[in-house]
Amino acid sequence: MGHFRLVYQDYHLDLPIEEPRITLRASSGSSPGKELEDDVVLDLEVKSPKFFFDPNNDPEDDVAQWLNPGLDTQWLKIPLKHFENGDYRSLQKIRVDFQGEGTRNALTGEDWWEAPGLITTYSDEFFTRAVISMNYDGDGRFSVHLSGATQFDTAFDIAFSAPLTVKLVGYRKTATADELLSWFDRFLSKEDFNLTPTQRGEDLYLDGAAKAGR
């Protein structure tokens, strides 16, 4: 259960949800000198089927266009200090309150220097404000709720649940599987996750999900 509600061009849309994901991401070597840091990205993703938006039943209308709705928070970084005792259930204590670039980021104690996410409609629309909360549902699953607005005045209210997954990457031989695991274990106990390494050329991927029943 969940919802994906937008107010787009002053029209209220209640859209179906596809491919919900809650992922902790980190990488080294994605650019020269890029190393693993003391924070991890909390990437909340959801999609909705592409459709032709034609509220006035007139394909020549200025508002008629193809929409490809989605959500992505790939710039939302959570510092190490917010992970308590290596328990992934501590994520439910994290609350994001983004009120625009230059406002205070309570997660880091510094100012936001970029939007933590975006909504996709006809194009990408970065958040101008957003409130995000999480709740642990058990068996490695979380529910998330996001609400706010974008740079093009699209309002959003989104809720969904999904298993907690992990995606770690060592690009260009910059990290071994043991090094990625050791780094991740500083945040959350690696024993609480089923993680599988995959080598693709010089790049090492470590993917998995939280174990059910923990």
Predicted regions, residues:
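An ectodomain-focused feature that recognizes extracytoplasmic/extracellular
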Residues: 1-119, 204-213
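Intrinsically disordered, low-complexity regions enriched in small/polar residues
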Residues: 10-13, 90, 100, 124, ...
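Short, well-ordered strand-loop elements centered on a beta-strand within folded domains, enriched
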Residues: 37-39, 141-147, 173-183
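Compositionally biased, low-structure terminal segments
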Residues: 5, 25, 52-54, 143, ...
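Intrinsically disordered, low-complexity terminal/linker regions enriched in Pro/Ser/Gly
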Residues: 176-214
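A short, surface-exposed beta-strand/turn
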Residues: 152-180, 201, 205
